[in-house]
């Protein structure tokens, strides 16, 4: 196979050159109206042959290859090649959504609209993937990065997003994966949090995304530019359900908004966004959770309340998640924020199951008042009933306490996790400390070493905190 630098895309390049030449020759007057660019309006790149296509690398018929895509002990390189016009479309769309690049400003009132997808070529290990759907991703982290003038933005990839336009890529996959997230390690100068936290959840036996380190290079018209160290994250609505549940046909929700707190009376369909079975207008499983959680038997007949709640919600999974999350700490999760989790109605059990998401803020005390205490003494009363009610129940609290001990003696054992930090520090340091200005959250290489030191200190402090709590 040729490397991506050796491969040619004559149609794309010739079209781009022709467009630039015409713009230079004819210019435009102040009276000209510039219409928003739309992908594919001016670039005719539909006539191509997918010469690198193989069943193993590109076909839907291949099983997801986790060993290839999510290898733990290496840093892999991935390249995006985007025409200058389409790159500008992405930037213009961001400006329309969030204001001028690098000019600061506050957070928008909502994140109702995702950034625009454009077709791009993806290169990995000398192989090309064709007309891959590519867009920026994220909410507050995306806006903050953009407003700070940093182009190290997170990306979402959908390998057959544009199959209707390009029939050659029908059901295109990346080693069995349709969708992937490439996260920018926002505000994480260690660049380890997303991966390590995700691994702790999975090593605890909870369903969750595989992760891996990648370096990203983007060529948007002037050659490859190093965008830095990223974390590749498996998508829940793609292969997590397919490979970690026996039946992946249930309802998957990604709650975001006031109702995601599960406070009584706050349910709205718009908050519980469906990521599967979207055409089925049925939220009865979510309503059953609200009803069971807030049933009057909670204060009059605790055993009956637990039985009803356990029938519709996997409390065992949630309590284990809660223990892991509270030990490792993450302020950007349920209990402080109304997002960053999925609910899956597992057909095998008939219960809604909690799945964690988004761990770049984990493994630290955190912002906005910090993470929750192990005994939830700082939990806002009445605002987070799933934690408040379960922790107040002696049976559920005993399970939570048992899970705390398992986490701190297992996946988050101080010696184990510090050895992990040391191994990953050696692995990614050359790539992290060579990030370039405008594409990094580091102010200098010393920031990386300091961040690793803080992670090690945090691990020791959490062990002491759990020991004190359990005593």
Model regions and ranges:
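Bacterial N-terminal signal peptides that target proteins for export
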Residues: 2-16
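Hydrophobic alpha-helical membrane-insertion signals
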Residues: 52-140
